[in-house]
Amino acid sequence: PVVDSLTNPIFRKEIARDWGGGNSIIGDFQQDVDRFGNTMNSFMKQCCRMAKLYGSVFVFVDNDRTIEAGQKSAIEKRQYPYLYVIKPENVTNYKCDSSGVIREIEFKCGSTYSKSFAGYKVMMDTDTWKWTPTDWQVTRHDGVVEKGKNNLGFIPVVPVFGTEHENGDLLPLSPMISIARTNLTIYNLSSELRELLRNQAFSILCYPVTEGVPIDKALSSIKVGTNDMLLFDGEVGARPFFIAPEASQAQLLQSEIQRLIDDVYRQASLSSVTAVETKASGVAKQWDFENTNQVLADMAENLEVAEKKIMKYWSAYFGEEIDYKVIYPRDFGI
């Protein structure tokens, strides 16, 4: 829910996109940007969610190796540039110049899997791509299997950042690290609470043993628990009764879990959008909203910059520039 709350408001309203409307290839591309049927809007939403989770992701603008001339043929055979996402964990090496421009990048892509006897997927091989402004190559365990010239003169990869970063640092830490650690603590506490409720929260029947019945013999087959009785040497007139542990231990765990849940939303700058009822002044609530709005606006700006660069690289494959405009929202009030 935290990542969704930092993603969905950005795409709540339709993103304004315009490229003049005269290029049919762009319109067709916008409806299927990755050859999996995802529109530009849904693709950028996926990038937003992944960037928040990982700190950054990389959008690669690739194309078929052999292209037939003519827009009609390109549309019919879907032979125009497409997009795919590279997770930061698959980036094995990169180099940037003093301006922050990527001059070299290596990443893993196109893994081959096989099913084991137990039914699990086992990775058999993977391709390692290396791109520079002048060429590219693909290597596997047995060496280079494919290579070619990069006629663009630059590497068509666009980083999408989900957090603040230094220039040239393409792999910043995820903003969700502290939240993930807190969630792990919540998971462990919830497990302890469940164990406590299962073993202790049910009353135990205490039953008096009448005079003349050996108490040791009666207890030999009894285990203390919710499915057994606890026998005791009863006096005349003693009545059965139930005992139960104090609820204070469970209440302590519940209050700590709730405190950590509130802290998760605080760390994510989402205190103003949670349903937790707290006593706060109007000024304090306004500050919370401004903080949340700024976090969303910063992410929206990152997406806007990335999408413009994606379309710039996309049009470079055709050797032309397009007047592509996109505007992401900056105000997320209700």
Segments predicted by a language model, with ranges:
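Short amphipathic alpha-helical segments
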Residues: 25, 35-43, 51, 178, ...
